[in-house]
């Protein structure tokens, strides 16, 4: 999904839907939720406690990027819990430009038709070295290897987030582990330098 070049390309409603995706996902992971860390464009929403008009509004995001502990992919129970949770949320594997299904990028639509993208990231230098590439899998779920992304396991904050669950299943509150200012900045710098990734409008 192409990232907007300006602030106007984002909407608060879409960002709130991304928040709903995150809370719904964590709600169904049980003890494994503690192995999931938010990075990417949704993170600044929780790094800055002040809200407008004290500070400029958070521009928003179009997807949810999470770094997962590799144990989720290697532990049978954890893997099946994640797989079942994605299915319950209506997620399916997204496709790349060549129409190939991806094991690390998933998508679903909300009740009002908004397309939600979830990207699973991991740091596995012993498997993929320093390359940004999908990790091998024998199933349908894997993660995109992002070198150094595991720094978020040590450099993170915890924020309580309340959101309406997908599927009109009520409202829930979850404790979200997310990158702190140091790890967020480092990972964004790495993405810009190593992958020539286009940053969100508010990150430049």
What are the residue ranges of the model-derived segments?
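Compositionally biased terminal segments of proteins
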Residues: 1-204
